[in-house]
């Protein structure tokens, strides 16, 4: 009767084997459990081999096996619930890690888009700077050409003024020589008149009335010639004064033109210097932006492009500095050549020389007036004829 009871017990073994597959679940969930809590390793290592050992031990009776199983069922259930909780925690952590991963990916995409926008804005900024530098170069070139043309016109005007001054100086010398010659003629005629008057006084006692009449006529002619020569001398002096005033006015206008050109060149030089400083500041800002972009972005192609743009702007800056230096040196040369102080000193020297000549002529006239030599009537008539011829030539 006991044997049939043992069979149902043997038949119950497959029914009570349902808790045994739990260790298989534990083996499948071993990685997640290992990541979440190290206690699962101890549970799986300590409990599962015992169950397997109890299962494999065929020598133990079925009643003991059933008792052991009924005693281990709560433990297995507790371990299963613990493992389920750990699995739930692992799933939650996995979900959190996936959410963090998605957030990190979204942030990376946003950063990538922002970097692309920054690159596009930097490219547009560099293109705008390049266009501005090209336009500035064109304006500078046109302004330099205009200044060169104006400088050429000013130099031609200055050279023409200098030529006019030279012509006036030569005319001044001619008029002074004519003035000295006319003064000499006047003095000689006055001397001749005095001689004739003395001869007339001496010839009162003579009986020749014809000679007296001739001498009177000669005296009248000499007086007329003296008045004509005096008027010619006065006209020469007035012409000399007018030409001197005109030459001084022209020199003053040339000096004012030179000062105006000099001030205009200095003003333009200051403007170009300010423009160059502004361009240098822009280049420094571009260099700083380039360094920041190099730190943020490691793309070598954009870096080379920016460096080439920077070198082009720097080369254009050097060209403008060279043009400014050339313009400055040309301006200094023109100002040195157009120095009117030398011309004023020359005119003063000529004036002083004319005064010296005039004083020398006056002293010579005084010496001639003090001379008491007499000439014959024939020589006086010849001298009068010569002075008449000279006077006619002067009138012609």
UniProtKB/Swiss-Prot annotation:
- The main location is membrane
A biological process from GO:
cortical microtubule organization
Record has Cytoplasm as a keyword: yes
Subcellular location(s): the record lists:
Cell membrane; Cytoplasm, Cytoskeleton
Residue numbers spanned by region Disordered: 1-49, 99-122
Report biased composition (Basic and acidic residues) as residue ranges: 99-115
- GO CC term, one of those recorded: plasma membrane
Q: Which UniProt keywords apply?
A: Cell membrane, Coiled coil, Cytoplasm, Cytoskeleton, Membrane
Swapping residue 349 to A leads to an effect described as: No effect on ROPs binding
Question: Could you list the residue ranges forming a coiled coil in this record?
Answer: 67-124, 158-366
The record's tissue-specificity note reads: Expressed in xylem cells in the roots and in stamens, petals and pollen.
Function recorded in the entry: ROP effector binding specifically activated ROPs and linking them to the microtubule cytoskeleton. Involved in ROP-regulated polar growth. Involved in local disassembly of cortical microtubules when associated with ARAC10 and KIN13A and conversely also mediates the elimination of ARAC10 from the plasma membrane by the cortical microtubules. Accumulates at the plus end of shrinking microtubules. Targets KIN13A to microtubules.
Task: Write out the similarity annotation.
Answer: Belongs to the ICR family.
Q: What is known of its domains?
A: The N-terminal part (1-122) is necessary and sufficient for homooligomerization and for binding to microtubules while the C-terminal domain is anchored to the plasma membrane.
> Assembly state and interactors?
Component of the active ARAC10-IRC5-KIN13A complex. Homooligomer. Interacts (via C-terminus) with ARAC4, ARAC10, ARAC11 and (via N-terminus) with KIN13A (via C-terminus), but no interactions with SEC3A.
Give the protein's recorded name. Answer: Interactor of constitutive active ROPs 5
Upper classification of the source organism reads: Eukaryota, Viridiplantae, Streptophyta, Embryophyta, Tracheophyta
